[in-house]
Amino acid sequence: MGVFNYETETTSVIPAARLFKAFILEGDTLIPKVAPQAISSVENIEGNGGPGTIKKITFPEGSPFKYVKERVDEVDHANFKYSYSMIEGGALGDTLEKICNEIKIVATPDGGSILKISNKYHTKGDHEMKAEHMKAIKEKGEALLRAVESYLLAHSDAYN
């Protein structure tokens, strides 16, 4: 098994606390609402949302995958940090054992935020992750962020 790391940063005009609340803490209900073309639903299979919780993310018809299951590893409200692992489903395929993800949202002096994202791909056997595959995953995550950001800009009273 190999482990391939991919780190990226992206900025948002939304303040860190508000973005953490909307994108991370309430994302299970907000993201299917603002990006139904990407995610149909998110349901807790086990747990209450904290560490150890297992979530099932269902994708819309026509998507390359039907679902994935994720395990919440850490929710740090004080530092706007969230860690989770993708543990089952189509996105892992025959080549990945799991994907461990960490998102940390940092406030910027201008009132916006920076999302620092770390992904660790745990491969099966001697499989290697291709840069274009990791880039495609980053672009999908960025699209979800922009959908949430647009919603928050249009609804200034939401998730404060």
Curated annotation (Swiss-Prot):
InterPro entries: Bet_v_I/MLP, Bet_v_I_allergen, Plant_def-hormone_signal, START-like_dom_sf. Brassinolide binds at residues 55, 82, 84, 101. It is found in: Cytoplasm. Transmembrane segments: none annotated. One of its GO terms (biological process) is abscisic acid-activated signaling pathway. The keyword Cytoplasm applies. SUPFAM superfamilies: Bet v1-like. The keyword Chaperone does not apply. Keywords: Allergen, Cytoplasm, Pathogenesis-related protein, Plant defense. It holds the Pfam family Bet_v_1. One of its GO terms (cellular component) is nucleus. It comes from the Eukaryota. One of its GO terms (molecular function) is abscisic acid binding. Belongs to the BetVI family. May be a general steroid carrier protein. This is Major pollen allergen Bet v 1-B. It comes from Betula pendula. The gene is BETV1B.
